[in-house]
Amino acid sequence: SGGPFREAYNLSYTDVYDFSNVKQGLKKFGIELGMHHQEFGERWDQPVDENKWEMAAQYCANDVYITEAVFNSRKADWAARLILAELTGMTPNNSTNQLVSKLIFGEDRNPQLVYTDLSETFPGYEWKQLSDGKFHNMYRGDDVGMGGYVYAEPGIYTNVALLDIASMHPTSLINMNYFGKYTKNYADIKEARIAIKHGDIKKISGMFDGKLNKYLGDPAILSDLAFALKIALNSTYGLTSARFDNIMKHPKNVNNIVALRGALFMRTLQDEVQKQ
């Protein structure tokens, strides 16, 4: 076979870059962590003079030191990876996407996803091609983008309210039943995270067939669990609109309906607030 042997990846235990939620090069990590930086100006496809071997070794060692420092600085990500691996019966070497897919869909590799036409929920919404030749999410005369709609009126304001919508994108995904029969599994992840935030240990103990119970006695580990569930929630709705094919992307979802639903709601809310 000319293809890769999948299990060969598990010759390693994990990949720091993969489990880190911050995706950047080792050099940038080193700078941010205040580590010593060392370059080696020799060509790697040519023999190195013996009098420079020690310098080459120092260069390689420097990368190891920075990798260890990155691991220590991303311990919360690592704890989350271990928890997701345990919940799914997979390994810490599996990617976050693989772990979350297993947590939601189990062994089903072709789940039947549900696409919702949001023009039925928000009359007047259009996925429309404009003069630039590209399609845009248009609603009430505005391009609301692909999610994350922002509106502001310049000025100085006092005595203002700061309001937040909890878990807007995950809630949209659940309300649209995007994952079909597996939507409940995703909803359970959200409910478990909320229960942890509210200290509702009794509710958590009955979820995921009791797999979470071992984490409930230690507040520090409970915090790691909450972070693991947050990663599962956030990585999921990103995959629904990814540019590449994956188990969570519906082929019709070119307009990013999970984030779009929230943007359409906020644009509707804008008009209602301005009426007051």
Residue ranges and their predicted role:
Residues 50-54, 58-176, 223-264, 268:
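Common nucleic-acid-contacting/processivity interface regions adjacent to the catalytic cores
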Residues 38, 264-276:
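Active-site palm subdomain of RNA-directed nucleic acid polymerases
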Residues 177-188:
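Cytochrome P450 catalytic domain signature, combining two hallmark sequence patches
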Residues 186-234:
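Conserved catalytic alpha/beta cores of large enzymes that bind or transform nucleotide phosphates
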Residues 29-33, 71, 193-196, 269-273:
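Hydrophobic, Leu/Ile/Phe/Ala-enriched alpha-helical segments that form helix-helix packing faces
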Residues 1-64:
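Active-site-proximal helix-loop-helix substrate-binding element of RNase H-like nuclease domains
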Residues 2-4, 36-47, 137-145, 200-210, ...:
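Active-site-adjacent bridging/hinge elements
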